[in-house]
Amino acid sequence: MEVGKNIFYTVNHLCHMVLALKPFGCMPSTQSDGVQSRVVSKFKDMIFLPIETSGEGEVNAHSRVQMALAEAKAKARAEFEGVLNKTGRTMDDLREYVADHPELRRGLYKVPHQDGIAGTAAQFAVHVDALMSRDRAYRRRSRVAMARPKVA
């Protein structure tokens, strides 16, 4: 089941990393680790980290988690930069629009899931870009700002 979930989350772009917390010495856990190594070799972008609850030093487990998180963070950052390049928006564009629309800053605001995007920030950027494209008042305001000559 663990292997299937890992494949599902990776193929459907639902996360950047899977961390499996397992009891030490559990036979099904040991078997799934063997299968998981084969699966990870097939899906090159998959980040999978098995951690056993005992038998492994706390410092060792902590450093392994930190390394895997750094990989996942880099993957999420690259995905976000790709979304910005694809939409043609800048961070300042997104921040300005969000500042003018306080509902987007609510903690419980539901951002719709976009297929092929795993990261929350990238999902939000795609969503705000779609809102900006549909917002006539915003488009009109941005055209007026571009039409004004800049005085030195």
Predicted regions: what they are:
Residues 1-152:
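An N-terminal assembly and electron-transfer interface module characteristic of large anaerobic redox
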